[in-house]
Amino acid sequence: SKGIIPFGDDLNQVKSYILKSNLEISKWLIRPSILWISQTDIWLNIVILIGICSSFLLIAGLIPHIAIMSSWISYLSIAVVSEPFLNFQWDALLLETYFLSFFLVPWKLHHDRNSLANPPALSRWLLWLLAFKLMFESGVVKFTFYGVGGSNAWRDLTALNYHFWTQPIPSWISYYIDKLPTIFDKVALIFT
């Protein structure tokens, strides 16, 4: 609540915006978060603990629907008030996957992962569609994103000139790959 960007300040700004604008919209629609209930560190820790416990329940195969939904609600609640930190492509992908997985798991108290039960076809198709969306959008952005000065690092084959030292989760080998000749970068870009 008193961190770098306190989530309580964000929620209060949303609340005052709704009041000033005379909007007939719920604050829950603008920021769908159970952190509206309380903006204290204790409640934030409870929400995090709910997410952790429900993840363990999901791993154990216990009450999978409740576990997925409570994990999704916990993560969504934290993500919408932590946009500078949880606003990456994989955060949205994780939320979408959680939501679609709710329709994938069987309605049982305990799900044995070794069972041969087929998930519903619609659920499988929705997850395949999500995987296609990820791959398609990842490819489209390479050709439609223009940086400063109208340059496109993917079209110019220069994106890997800085990728290895600016990637979000760098590998120990990134330093060494960055030192390879630039022709390696260009060939790698052609094949991605």
Where are these regions (language model features)?
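Alpha-helical membrane-anchoring segments
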Residues: 1-192
